[in-house]
Amino acid sequence: VSVVIHSSQFPENVRHDLLQSLRSRQVNHKFHYDSIKQTQKWLALHQVYSPSRTDEDCAAIYDGSFAAAAWQIASRQIHLIGLGCGGGQKDTRLLKLLNEQGKEISYTPSDVSVAMVLVAQQAANSVVAPERCFPFVCDLASPEGVDEIFSNVDANSTRLLTFFGMIPNFEPQLILPKLAAMLRPNDWLLFSANLAPGNDYSAGVQRILPLYDNE
């Protein structure tokens, strides 16, 4: 399996980001998934606690969005780019649906961890031919552009980008302009947002804040 590693994840840049995290006392989210062991632990935790795994209503929301996208995209050729693909389970469900509808599919799983993109690639193996899968390691928060992520997209393919469960890792004012810059006419973006419960945002944040208390 060939994995492309963007310069944002070259050792000198990772070291710079780690030092910046220590100096600012704010750990960059990518260091939660840096090693193989961390990736395995995160995937195990996600499997047990993620609403997309444990809540039928949540899973139905994803499935409904997949069905809507598959129905509305008229192109026969679709290249799915999973931004922050994680273990690739959601992307694989979407790819399976597109495949069942007779679409010619390709897949670029992208994340900050080599281990993570390989897990996603393996998850998609049952649906996407190995020669049509292009694992790509990058840091979307990098000031450098990540246009290389599209290097394997056929000119005749419609680009379908997914951005699932990622927004809590970024400040909106940082990531939203980057997402907008990546999109071109006729692209599609499926984006999940983590919302605080209830109509009172401040009260909703206080309800979920204990979930992030790791002490």
Language model regions located:
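Conserved beta-strand signature within the Rossmann-like core of class I S-adenosyl-L-methionine
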Residues: 183-198
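Conserved Class I S-adenosyl-L-methionine
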Residues: 204-215
